[in-house]
């Protein structure tokens, strides 16, 4: 049985704290995608009240945005609704869990395998967060400006009903 030292505890805590910064940033990035999806759903309802010619163009843009949101979400984790046990090693969620397991598997200073797993998870998180940020700051922002620029018609025009 190996003895645990204060140096070991301190090293584990420091690495864990640094790693949780990656997890926190990843969660914030994924939350942005979820918020964008919610806004997209609201936009769909607003678009239904617009003129047909405008609807057609906006629906095409929405389809592209929705597709991008799904693709980016799939970088984080597998799509919802899959049956059975799914183990996709290529998702960011899997990489984060792998690194977390390595960090928590020993009572001594994290070894090379743990540090390699943490490095891989951090690199993947940075790439994924960068992709989300680019999407939010370019494509989604343009779409958002388009929707915000609409003269919103929430109510359909109604005429009194008469029996003739």
Language model segments and positions:
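Low-complexity, Pro/Ser/Thr- and charge-rich linker/hinge segments at domain boundaries
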Residues: 1-21
């Amino acid at each position: 049985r190996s003895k645990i030292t204060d140096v070991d505890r301190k090293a584990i805590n420091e690495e864990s704290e640094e790693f949780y910064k990656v997890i926190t940033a990843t969660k914030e990035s994924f939350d942005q995608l979820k918020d964008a999806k919610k806004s997209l759903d609201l936009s769909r309802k607003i678009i239904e009240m617009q003129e047909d010619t405008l609807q057609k163009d906006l629906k095409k843009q929405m389809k592209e945005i929705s597709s991008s949101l799904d693709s980016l979400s799939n970088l984080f984790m597998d799509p919802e609704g899959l049956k059975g046990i799914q183990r996709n090693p290529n998702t960011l969620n899997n990489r984060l869990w792998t690194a977390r397991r390595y960090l928590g598997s020993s009572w001594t200073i994290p070894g090379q395998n743990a540090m390699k797993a943490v490095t891989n998870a951090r690199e993947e998180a940075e790439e994924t967060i960068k992709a989300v940020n680019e999407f939010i700051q370019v494509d989604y922002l343009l779409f958002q400006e388009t929707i915000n620029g609409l003269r919103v018609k929430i109510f359909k025009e109604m005429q009194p009903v008469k029996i003739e």
